[in-house]
Swiss-Prot record:
Monomer. GO terms for molecular function: hydroxymethylbilane synthase activity. InterPro entries: HemC, Porphobilin_deaminase_cofac_BS, Porphobilin_deaminase_N, Porphobilinogen_deaminase_C, Porphobilinogen_deaminase_C_sf. GO terms for biological process: protoporphyrinogen IX biosynthetic process. HAMAP family: Porphobil_deam (MF_00260). It holds the Pfam family Porphobil_deam. Its EC number is 2.5.1.61. It comes from Leifsonia xyli subsp. xyli (strain CTCB07). This is Porphobilinogen deaminase.
Length: 329
């Protein structure tokens, strides 16, 4: 049973799951909670937390990007207001959080970006000068690299707010994550999908993260059982490799960096690209690693190894001079 928006006090036997209050955050937290409930039989109580990123109207680059959606959730977890919290993994800082650990990463949804355009237009059909909205410096740089003649507009707001700007004629299109549209039942709004090879997405995009207090992930307690019920080893390895790029570059999530990792035929492949904000230049590095096994420890080791090699190549090629990378990690 899922109980939404309950008080911070624990209901007898209920597992309290913290979430942001946006429709997308609630939808994805409900999906994870339902999976935990099915696997464990636990009652789940959602605890809604308002974050600075939800209330501020500044752009992500002005806010500093990383941590604006995570800090309040982490505070609620440390204060005992909830037993675990659910983040969009792409919004979770890569630097360790004192007293907290990343306990589980469920199976990733579609990691691609989508175009949601007026009149069903595909990306190549947008006229010169068409206005395309995005709040992501990475997406803005990628769009400029592919179509320099587009008018890229910095926007904020939830999925419905962004889509409404297209339907109202304020914008010709917006770029949104396929995973978010799917979780909200709005994938029909997508008029085109960008391939990961031409438009690599934010490290961790499409994946969720379950964060807990340090120690709660171990043993056979209810929190550890909940984590084990939804953790997906290959998603965890792929996103660990992607996030190792951000960590190694000392970059925040507002940095114009795209990364894609996948496991195929026994190899863990990672490709990452750093973009100049105007889209006029970019650097790409790709490497692969062979895990000793597909156990969690060996996958994690391979992910960190391939991430370090990709970062080393990017930095040696001048990535730090190409784009503003520094940010809270």
């Amino acid at each position: 049973m899922i109980v939404s928006d309950g008080p911070a006090e624990r209901r007898q036997g209920a597992l309290r799951v913290g979430t942001r209050g946006s429709p997308l955050a609630v939808a994805q937290t409900q999906a994870v909670s339902a999976a935990v409930a099915r696997a464990t039989g636990f009652d789940i109580e959602l605890v809604t937390v308002t974050t600075h990123g939800d209330t501020s109207r500044e752009s992500l680059s002005e806010l500093g990007g990383t941590g604006v959606f995570a800090t309040a959730l982490r505070d609620a977890l440390r204060n005992g207001e909830c037993d675990l919290v659910v983040h969009s993994l792409k919004d979770l800082p890569t630097a360790p959080a004192p007293g907290l650990v990343l306990g589980a990463v469920p199976k990733r949804a579609d990691a691609r970006d989508t175009l949601c355009a007026r009149d069903g237009l595909r990306f190549g059909e947008l006229p010169e000068g068409a206005s395309v909205g995005t709040g992501s410096p990475r997406r803005a740089a990628q769009l400029r690299a592919q179509r320099p003649g587009l008018d890229i507009v910095d926007i904020r707001g939830n999925v419905d707010t962004r889509l409404s700007r297209v339907s109202a004629g304020d914008l010709d299109a917006v770029v949104l994550a396929a995973a978010g549209l799917g979780r909200l039942g709005r994938l029909d709004a997508a008029t085109d999908f960008f391939s990961l090879s031409t438009m690599p997405t934010a490290p961790g995009q499409g994946a969720l993260a379950l964060e807990v207090r340090e120690g709660d992930e171990r043993g056979r307690g209810p929190i550890a059982r909940a984590l084990a019920a939804v953790d997906h080893a290959t998603t965890c390895a792929a996103t660990t490799a992607e996030r190792a790029v951000l960590a190694g570059l000392e970059a925040g999530c507002a940095a114009p960096v795209g990364a894609t990792a996948m496991i195929d035929d026994g190899l863990l492949f990672l490709t990452a690209t750093v973009y100049r904000p105007d889209g006029a230049a970019q650097l790409t590095a790709s490497h692969a690693a062979t895990p000793d096994s597909f156990g969690a420890a060996h996958l994690d080791e391979a992910a960190r190894d391939v991430g370090e090699r990709v970062v080393a190549e990017l930095l040696a090629s001048g990535a730090a001079d190409l784009a503003p990378l520094k940010g809270l990690r």
